[in-house]
Design a protein with these regions (language model features):
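A hydrophobic alpha-helical transmembrane-helix feature that marks the membrane cores
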Residues: 1-250
Protein backbone atom coordinates (compact mmCIF):
# COMPACT_ATOMS: atom_id res chain seq x y z
CA UNK A 1 0.00 0.00 0.00
CA UNK A 2 2.30 2.74 -1.22
CA UNK A 3 -0.19 5.56 -0.77
CA UNK A 4 0.85 7.03 2.62
CA UNK A 5 -2.82 7.56 3.39
CA UNK A 6 -3.46 3.83 3.10
CA UNK A 7 -0.96 2.51 5.63
CA UNK A 8 -0.91 -1.13 6.74
CA UNK A 9 -1.41 -0.01 10.34
CA UNK A 10 -4.63 1.75 9.42
CA UNK A 11 -5.80 -1.29 7.46
CA UNK A 12 -5.25 -3.73 10.33
CA UNK A 13 -6.74 -1.51 13.03
CA UNK A 14 -9.96 -0.77 11.19
CA UNK A 15 -10.78 -4.34 10.20
CA UNK A 16 -11.61 -5.12 13.83
CA UNK A 17 -13.22 -1.78 14.61
CA UNK A 18 -16.88 -1.74 15.63
CA UNK A 19 -19.32 0.03 13.34
CA UNK A 20 -22.92 -0.20 12.19
CA UNK A 21 -22.04 -1.50 8.73
CA UNK A 22 -19.24 -2.72 6.54
CA UNK A 23 -17.32 -1.07 3.75
CA UNK A 24 -18.26 -1.87 0.15
CA UNK A 25 -16.67 -0.97 -3.17
CA UNK A 26 -19.96 0.50 -4.38
CA UNK A 27 -20.32 2.66 -1.29
CA UNK A 28 -16.78 3.93 -1.71
CA UNK A 29 -17.46 4.76 -5.35
CA UNK A 30 -20.52 6.82 -4.39
CA UNK A 31 -18.59 8.70 -1.74
CA UNK A 32 -15.77 9.33 -4.22
CA UNK A 33 -18.30 10.97 -6.54
CA UNK A 34 -19.56 13.08 -3.64
CA UNK A 35 -16.02 14.28 -2.92
CA UNK A 36 -15.43 15.08 -6.59
CA UNK A 37 -18.61 17.18 -6.52
CA UNK A 38 -17.36 19.00 -3.40
CA UNK A 39 -14.04 19.68 -5.13
CA UNK A 40 -15.92 21.19 -8.07
CA UNK A 41 -17.91 23.46 -5.74
CA UNK A 42 -14.74 24.86 -4.18
CA UNK A 43 -13.00 25.13 -7.55
CA UNK A 44 -15.86 27.00 -9.17
CA UNK A 45 -15.79 29.59 -6.40
CA UNK A 46 -12.10 30.48 -6.69
CA UNK A 47 -12.29 30.28 -10.49
CA UNK A 48 -15.10 32.85 -10.35
CA UNK A 49 -13.11 35.05 -7.97
CA UNK A 50 -10.03 34.89 -10.20
CA UNK A 51 -11.92 35.93 -13.32
CA UNK A 52 -14.24 38.53 -11.82
CA UNK A 53 -11.94 40.26 -9.33
CA UNK A 54 -10.45 43.62 -10.27
CA UNK A 55 -7.23 42.53 -8.61
CA UNK A 56 -6.27 38.97 -9.71
CA UNK A 57 -4.19 38.60 -6.55
CA UNK A 58 -7.40 38.55 -4.50
CA UNK A 59 -7.75 34.84 -5.25
CA UNK A 60 -4.45 34.00 -3.55
CA UNK A 61 -5.73 34.00 0.07
CA UNK A 62 -8.44 31.52 -0.92
CA UNK A 63 -6.01 29.44 -2.95
CA UNK A 64 -3.27 29.24 -0.33
CA UNK A 65 -5.81 28.91 2.47
CA UNK A 66 -7.30 25.94 0.66
CA UNK A 67 -3.89 24.35 0.12
CA UNK A 68 -2.76 24.76 3.73
CA UNK A 69 -6.15 23.87 5.17
CA UNK A 70 -6.40 20.83 2.92
CA UNK A 71 -2.97 19.63 4.01
CA UNK A 72 -3.84 19.99 7.70
CA UNK A 73 -7.16 18.18 7.30
CA UNK A 74 -5.45 15.44 5.28
CA UNK A 75 -2.94 14.89 8.07
CA UNK A 76 -5.72 14.63 10.64
CA UNK A 77 -7.63 12.11 8.54
CA UNK A 78 -4.47 10.07 7.97
CA UNK A 79 -4.00 9.66 11.72
CA UNK A 80 -7.72 9.41 12.54
CA UNK A 81 -9.44 7.47 9.72
CA UNK A 82 -12.72 7.36 11.64
CA UNK A 83 -12.95 11.14 11.25
CA UNK A 84 -12.89 10.80 7.46
CA UNK A 85 -16.68 10.62 7.38
CA UNK A 86 -16.78 14.18 8.73
CA UNK A 87 -13.57 15.71 7.41
CA UNK A 88 -13.27 14.23 3.90
CA UNK A 89 -15.92 16.61 2.47
CA UNK A 90 -14.14 19.54 4.13
CA UNK A 91 -10.86 18.39 2.61
CA UNK A 92 -12.51 18.18 -0.80
CA UNK A 93 -13.86 21.74 -0.62
CA UNK A 94 -10.50 23.10 0.56
CA UNK A 95 -8.65 21.31 -2.22
CA UNK A 96 -11.25 22.65 -4.63
CA UNK A 97 -10.46 26.20 -3.54
CA UNK A 98 -6.79 25.57 -4.27
CA UNK A 99 -7.37 23.78 -7.56
CA UNK A 100 -9.79 26.43 -8.81
CA UNK A 101 -7.30 29.19 -8.09
CA UNK A 102 -4.26 27.47 -9.58
CA UNK A 103 -6.28 26.35 -12.60
CA UNK A 104 -7.44 29.92 -13.24
CA UNK A 105 -3.83 31.12 -13.07
CA UNK A 106 -2.74 28.53 -15.62
CA UNK A 107 -5.74 29.28 -17.82
CA UNK A 108 -4.96 32.99 -17.88
CA UNK A 109 -1.22 32.47 -18.35
CA UNK A 110 -1.71 30.10 -21.30
CA UNK A 111 -4.83 31.68 -22.80
CA UNK A 112 -2.98 32.31 -26.07
CA UNK A 113 -0.41 29.52 -26.26
CA UNK A 114 -2.55 26.70 -24.84
CA UNK A 115 -6.25 27.61 -24.73
CA UNK A 116 -8.26 24.98 -22.93
CA UNK A 117 -5.30 23.76 -20.89
CA UNK A 118 -7.45 23.29 -17.78
CA UNK A 119 -10.14 21.34 -19.59
CA UNK A 120 -7.50 19.18 -21.25
CA UNK A 121 -5.85 18.47 -17.89
CA UNK A 122 -9.23 17.58 -16.38
CA UNK A 123 -10.14 15.23 -19.23
CA UNK A 124 -6.72 13.58 -19.19
CA UNK A 125 -6.99 13.03 -15.44
CA UNK A 126 -10.42 11.41 -15.85
CA UNK A 127 -9.23 9.31 -18.79
CA UNK A 128 -6.16 8.16 -16.87
CA UNK A 129 -8.28 7.15 -13.88
CA UNK A 130 -10.66 5.15 -16.09
CA UNK A 131 -7.80 3.43 -17.94
CA UNK A 132 -6.06 2.50 -14.69
CA UNK A 133 -9.33 1.14 -13.30
CA UNK A 134 -9.76 -1.03 -16.40
CA UNK A 135 -6.16 -2.22 -16.07
CA UNK A 136 -6.79 -3.09 -12.43
CA UNK A 137 -10.06 -4.89 -13.13
CA UNK A 138 -8.46 -6.86 -15.98
CA UNK A 139 -5.52 -7.74 -13.69
CA UNK A 140 -3.08 -6.73 -16.43
CA UNK A 141 -0.70 -5.58 -13.71
CA UNK A 142 -0.30 -7.69 -10.59
CA UNK A 143 -0.80 -5.44 -7.58
CA UNK A 144 1.11 -7.29 -4.88
CA UNK A 145 3.70 -6.60 -2.21
CA UNK A 146 6.52 -6.29 -4.73
CA UNK A 147 4.59 -3.75 -6.77
CA UNK A 148 3.76 -1.80 -3.62
CA UNK A 149 7.43 -1.71 -2.58
CA UNK A 150 8.47 -0.43 -6.00
CA UNK A 151 5.83 2.28 -5.79
CA UNK A 152 6.95 3.21 -2.30
CA UNK A 153 10.51 3.70 -3.55
CA UNK A 154 9.26 5.75 -6.50
CA UNK A 155 7.04 7.87 -4.28
CA UNK A 156 9.82 8.43 -1.77
CA UNK A 157 12.16 9.52 -4.56
CA UNK A 158 9.59 12.01 -5.85
CA UNK A 159 9.00 13.40 -2.35
CA UNK A 160 12.76 13.81 -1.94
CA UNK A 161 12.86 15.60 -5.30
CA UNK A 162 10.08 17.97 -4.24
CA UNK A 163 11.71 18.76 -0.90
CA UNK A 164 15.26 19.14 -2.23
CA UNK A 165 14.23 21.47 -5.07
CA UNK A 166 12.20 23.56 -2.62
CA UNK A 167 15.12 23.85 -0.19
CA UNK A 168 17.63 24.64 -2.95
CA UNK A 169 15.35 27.32 -4.38
CA UNK A 170 15.19 28.96 -0.95
CA UNK A 171 18.97 29.32 -1.06
CA UNK A 172 18.86 30.92 -4.49
CA UNK A 173 20.10 27.91 -6.45
CA UNK A 174 19.18 28.18 -10.14
CA UNK A 175 16.85 25.28 -10.95
CA UNK A 176 15.50 26.63 -14.22
CA UNK A 177 16.35 23.47 -16.15
CA UNK A 178 14.10 21.47 -13.81
CA UNK A 179 11.09 23.72 -14.25
CA UNK A 180 11.35 25.09 -17.78
CA UNK A 181 10.07 23.50 -20.99
CA UNK A 182 13.27 21.63 -21.77
CA UNK A 183 13.57 17.87 -22.35
CA UNK A 184 14.86 17.16 -18.83
CA UNK A 185 12.01 19.01 -17.16
CA UNK A 186 9.38 17.40 -19.39
CA UNK A 187 10.94 13.98 -18.81
CA UNK A 188 10.76 14.42 -15.04
CA UNK A 189 7.12 15.47 -15.27
CA UNK A 190 6.29 12.45 -17.43
CA UNK A 191 7.83 10.12 -14.85
CA UNK A 192 5.92 11.78 -12.00
CA UNK A 193 2.64 11.61 -13.93
CA UNK A 194 3.32 7.92 -14.56
CA UNK A 195 3.95 7.22 -10.89
CA UNK A 196 0.81 9.12 -9.88
CA UNK A 197 -1.21 7.09 -12.39
CA UNK A 198 0.13 3.77 -11.08
CA UNK A 199 -0.63 4.90 -7.54
CA UNK A 200 -4.29 4.62 -8.52
CA UNK A 201 -3.82 0.85 -8.81
CA UNK A 202 -2.79 0.72 -5.17
CA UNK A 203 -5.77 2.87 -4.20
CA UNK A 204 -8.16 0.54 -6.02
CA UNK A 205 -6.47 -2.46 -4.40
CA UNK A 206 -6.80 -0.99 -0.91
CA UNK A 207 -10.49 -0.26 -1.43
CA UNK A 208 -11.15 -3.77 -2.73
CA UNK A 209 -9.15 -5.57 -0.03
CA UNK A 210 -10.58 -3.46 2.80
CA UNK A 211 -14.10 -4.17 1.54
CA UNK A 212 -13.40 -7.90 1.34
CA UNK A 213 -11.98 -7.85 4.87
CA UNK A 214 -15.17 -6.28 6.23
CA UNK A 215 -13.72 -2.91 7.21
CA UNK A 216 -16.18 -0.60 9.00
CA UNK A 217 -18.54 1.60 6.99
CA UNK A 218 -16.65 4.83 7.68
CA UNK A 219 -13.71 3.42 5.75
CA UNK A 220 -15.68 4.14 2.58
CA UNK A 221 -15.04 7.82 3.26
CA UNK A 222 -11.42 7.05 4.05
CA UNK A 223 -10.98 5.10 0.83
CA UNK A 224 -12.64 7.88 -1.17
CA UNK A 225 -10.41 10.43 0.55
CA UNK A 226 -7.24 8.51 -0.29
CA UNK A 227 -8.34 8.17 -3.90
CA UNK A 228 -9.02 11.90 -4.02
CA UNK A 229 -5.51 12.67 -2.76
CA UNK A 230 -4.03 10.76 -5.68
CA UNK A 231 -6.40 12.32 -8.23
CA UNK A 232 -5.56 15.84 -7.05
CA UNK A 233 -1.84 15.08 -7.34
CA UNK A 234 -2.32 13.54 -10.78
CA UNK A 235 -4.32 16.54 -12.02
CA UNK A 236 -1.72 19.05 -10.83
CA UNK A 237 1.12 17.12 -12.46
CA UNK A 238 -0.77 16.76 -15.76
CA UNK A 239 -1.59 20.48 -15.71
CA UNK A 240 2.07 21.30 -15.19
CA UNK A 241 3.12 18.85 -17.92
CA UNK A 242 0.74 20.42 -20.44
CA UNK A 243 2.10 23.84 -19.55
CA UNK A 244 5.63 22.62 -20.25
CA UNK A 245 4.57 21.18 -23.59
CA UNK A 246 2.97 24.52 -24.46
CA UNK A 247 6.15 26.35 -23.55
CA UNK A 248 8.24 23.90 -25.56
CA UNK A 249 6.19 24.60 -28.69
CA UNK A 250 6.87 28.28 -28.33
Amino acid sequence: MANPVFSEKVFRSTVTAKDTGVMTVGGTAIKSLVLIFMVLIGAMYTWKVAYEAINPASVQPWMYGGAIGGFVVAMIISFKPIWAQYLAPIYAVLEGLFLGGISAIFSQAFATTAPGIVMNATLLTMLTAVVMLLIYRAKIIKVDGKFARIMMIALGTIMLYYISTWILSMFGVNLTMLHNSGPLSIGISLVIVGVAAFMLLLDFNFIEKASEAGAPKYMEWYGAFGLMVTLVWLYLEILQLLAKFAGNRN
